[in-house]
Design a protein with these regions (language model features):
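Conserved beta strand-loop-helix elements of the APE1-like EEP
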Residues: 1-12, 39, 121, 151-166, ...
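Short proline/glycine-enriched turn/loop segments at secondary-structure junctions
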Residues: 24-25, 145-150, 174-178
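Short hydrophobic/aromatic beta-strand or adjacent loop that forms the aromatic wall/cage
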Residues: 1, 29-35, 153-159, 181-186
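Metal-dependent phosphoesterases centered on the DNase I-like endonuclease/exonuclease/phosphatase
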Residues: 47, 57-164
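Structured beta-strand-rich core segments of catalytic domains in phosphoester-bond hydrolases
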Residues: 1-45, 51-53
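Low-complexity, intrinsically disordered Gly/Pro/Thr-rich segments
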Residues: 165-176
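Active-site metal-binding loops of divalent metal-dependent hydrolases
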Residues: 51-53, 88-90, 183
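Surface polyanion/phosphate-binding segment centered on an Asp-His-Pro turn
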Residues: 85-87, 182-193
């Protein structure tokens, strides 16, 4: 994971995420997110989270625990008056039903379930799924073989923002999965106040 900024990053921290204890521990990578702090002009901080959450968990419990930990950390920073943005690979179907949107049945691929929207209840945070309704582009393809246009595709890469951040746009760059099993995503935003 890498966080780059043209603004000075004051500090960085790696937070370990929960992982499974059973056999899946040996096939899933140790998961984490990084926390980078950028000072802004109103004596607050822009707190950036770069993440890569688990995909292949036995029952989805660990993935929910990981997302809950991130949401709780972001909410605590928001309550201090800071601006919060998380971005990365959630390994969740951020569009809820990517199979329908992209016209490729994902019934055989159960690893990317939708995000449970109730995880955000009582918070000042919201999910941003990069999407252009006129020309939808997936952010990820299933990596079970070389890329082909019949392969299962979906959007698992996106953002979470605090409500003091206004998002003006978010989409996926269509690179045709030339460099990896992911296409890059972007978000344009402004800090309020």
């Amino acid at each position: 994971m890498l966080t780059l900024s043209r603004f000075n990053i004051e500090s960085g921290l790696r937070r370990s995420l929960p992982i499974e204890d059973g056999f899946m521990k040996f096939v899933d990578l140790d998961r984490c997110y990084s926390v980078s702090r950028v000072s802004v002009s109103n004596d607050k901080e822009l707190v950036l989270y770069t993440l890569h959450l688990s995909a292949y968990t036995s029952d989805g419990t660990i993935a929910t625990e990981q997302l809950t930990m991130l949401i709780n950390d972001m909410q605590a920073e928001y309550e201090k008056g800071n601006y919060c943005i998380a971005g990365g690979d959630f390994n969740k179907d951020l569009l809820v039903d990517s199979g329908k949107i992209f016209g490729i049945d994902g019934a055989d691929y159960t690893w990317a379930q939708p995000v449970d929207p109730t995880l955000f209840d009582g918070t000042n945070l919201s999910m941003v799924a990069p999407f252009n309704e006129e020309k939808p582009i997936p952010s990820c393809r299933n990596a079970d073989g070389p890329y082909n246009d019949k392969q299962f595709v979906l959007t698992v890469d996106g953002f979470i923002v605090s409500d003091n951040v206004t998002v003006s746009g978010s989409d996926v760059y269509d690179l045709g999965f030339k460099y990896s099993d992911h296409n890059p995503v972007y978000m344009t935003f402004k800090l309020n106040g």
